[in-house]
């Protein structure tokens, strides 16, 4: 069995043949679904390479939005031994323990009171428990210290622009090398659910940068393209880690994109119905938040559409796997229902998603259809795990050879 270097980052793409990306959608409590799928993926990797390996050992970039940003941090934040603080199998227990406190449900008389007055006077939840928990969980870990490169989208409401936190940028722009806990709080601050999050960061030159953040889902609820763009930027900037990759060489990208499910296409809203809405109804209508539903769903689906077109055009559909389910019904489709029964149901839905047939987007209609090959998501994840394992072994072999050749060259010079 191979020994792991305690705090060494993964061998870069220049040592291999692929750029490997893991993307994790937002979705509130539905992040537990991604936890189920990631636990399965990590188990497949461990069967190939040993119990010591973790998901972060295999990806050049892990990107996450909102709840996906939290999972990204759990997978990549180092412990005292320089290894991932959490195994993927620990994500589900974490959600079961903490979601009921992050999203406390009203009980007794409070449960009977209308929710609208509360929403008009402030966010639905204070966010205090979330901030405290993330502070304890991630401590002083900075963005540049993650065990592989991470990309986490947020949106700054003061500048009205996305702020993309990237390990790559943190190395070149110290003002963006902030605490991972602050990033996670910011990317999870869904409007109407949690208050916007303010913090500042002072770099070594005394330059202070201010952040006024809300949920990254308003700009990129599915961060797949954001991650691909971050890598492309490094190629354009001639980052030596990227080797000889072409900026448009997406055929050399291997992408696993994990969704958190969405409501069944039940035509909940219509132009006729919405024509009568004012500001209040757009914010709250029959227990839903239409403006957020529309924003999150559109940013999620347009990314999958674009990614599907790109990989199909390059005849590389076999290197792009999207696991999601757009048939969730009732409580399962909510962002914040943290009851034990709903969380346990979401776990079952995650397990069901694994055995579902692989779905691909019809680029003409924009709808999901079964893939041409009769294969399930779990079988496809096994195939991707083998590719990831082979790529990692190749990189380590080439890196060892380069180190050996460099050592011989140094001895000859002496």
From Swiss-Prot:
**Active site positions:** 66 (nucleophile), 215 (proton acceptor)
The record's Gene3D superfamilies line, in alphabetical order, gives: Cytosolic phospholipase A2 catalytic domain (3.40.1090.10)
Per the record's keyword annotation, is Phosphoprotein included, yes or no?
Answer: yes
Induction conditions: By auxin.
Phenotype of the disrupted gene, per the record: Slight decrease in number of lateral roots.
Pfam families given for it?
Patatin
Q: What class of enzyme is it?
A: hydrolase
GO annotation, biological process: defense response; lateral root formation; lipid catabolic process
**InterPro entries associated with the record:** Acyl_Trfase/lysoPLipase, PNPLA_dom
Which keywords, in A-to-Z order, does the entry hold? Hydrolase, Lipid degradation, Lipid metabolism, Phosphoprotein, Plant defense
User: What sequence ranges are listed for the domain PNPLA?
Assistant: 22-228
Q: What is its EC number?
A: 3.1.1.-
Q: What PTMs does it carry?
A: Phosphorylated at Ser-399 by CPK3. Phosphorylation enhances PLP5 activity towards phosphatidylcholine.
Polar residues compositional bias: what residue ranges? 405-414
Where is region (Disordered) located?
A: 393-414
Q: Where is this motif: GXGXXG?
A: 26-31
Q: Could you state a single Gene Ontology molecular function term?
A: phospholipase activity
- Motif GXSXG: chain residues: 64-68
Q: Does the keyword Hydrolase apply?
A: yes
- Motif DGA/G: list the residue ranges: 215-217
Summarize tissue expression: Expressed in roots, cotyledons and leaves.
Phosphoserine modification, residue list? 399
Domain of life (superkingdom): Eukaryota
Task: Return the similarity comment.
Answer: Belongs to the patatin family.
Protein function: Possesses non-specific lipolytic acyl hydrolase (LAH) activity. Catalyzes the hydrolysis of the neutral lipids monogalactosyldiacylglycerol (MGDG), digalactosyldiacylglycerol (DGDG) and phosphatidylglycerol (PG), and less efficiently the polar lipids phosphatidylcholine (PC) and phosphatidylinositol (PI), but not the storage lipid triacylglycerol (TAG). May play a role in root development.
Q: What is this protein called?
A: Patatin-like protein 5
Organism, scientific name: Arabidopsis thaliana
Give the gene name. PLP5
């Amino acid at each position: 069995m191979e020994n792991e270097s305690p705090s060494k980052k993964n061998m870069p793409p220049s040592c291999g043949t692929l750029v490997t990306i893991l993307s994790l959608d937002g979705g509130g409590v539905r992040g537990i679904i991604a936890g189920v799928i990631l636990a399965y993926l990590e188990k497949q990797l461990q069967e190939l390479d040993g119990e010591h390996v973790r998901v972060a050992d295999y990806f050049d970039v892990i990107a996450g939005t909102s709840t996906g940003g939290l999972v990204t941090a759990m997978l990549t934040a180092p412990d005292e031994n320089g290894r991932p603080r959490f195994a993927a199998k620990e994500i589900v227990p974490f959600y079961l323990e903490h979601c009921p406190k992050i999203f406390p449900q009203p009980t007794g008389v409070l449960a009977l009171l209308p929710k609208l007055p509360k929403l008009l006077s402030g966010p639905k939840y204070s966010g205090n428990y979330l901030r405290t928990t993330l502070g304890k969980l991630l401590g002083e870990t900075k963005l540049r210290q993650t065990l592989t490169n991470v990309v986490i989208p947020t949106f700054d409401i003061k500048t009205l622009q996305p702020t993309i936190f990237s390990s790559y940028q943190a190395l070149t722009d110290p003002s963006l090398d902030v605490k991972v806990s602050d990033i996670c709080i910011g990317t999870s601050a869904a409007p109407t659910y949690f208050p916007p999050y303010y913090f500042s960061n002072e770099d070594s030159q005394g330059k202070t940068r201010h952040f006024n953040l809300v949920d990254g889902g308003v700009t990129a609820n599915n961060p797949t393209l954001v991650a691909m763009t971050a890598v492309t930027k490094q190629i354009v900037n001639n980052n030596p880690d990227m080797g000889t990759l072409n900026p448009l060489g997406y055929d050399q990208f291997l992408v696993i994109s994990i969704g958190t499910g969405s409501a069944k296409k039940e035509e909940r809203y219509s132009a006729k119905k919405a024509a009568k809405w004012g500001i209040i109804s757009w914010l709250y209508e029959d227990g839903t938040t239409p403006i957020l539903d529309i924003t999150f769903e559109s940013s999620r689906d347009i990314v999958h559409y674009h990614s599907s077109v790109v990989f199909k055009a390059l005849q590389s559909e076999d290197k792009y796997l999207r696991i999601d389910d757009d048939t969730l019904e009732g409580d399962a489709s909510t962002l914040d229902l943290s009851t034990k029964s709903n969380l346990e149901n979401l776990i079952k839905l995650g397990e069901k998603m694994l055995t579902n047939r692989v779905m691909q987007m019809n680029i003409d209609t924009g709808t999901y259809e079964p893939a041409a090959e009769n294969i399930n998501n779990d079988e496809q994840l096994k195939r991707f795990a083998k590719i990831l394992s082979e790529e990692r072994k190749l990189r380590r072999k080439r890196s060892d050879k380069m180190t050996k050749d460099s050592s011989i060259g140094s001895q000859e010079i002496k």
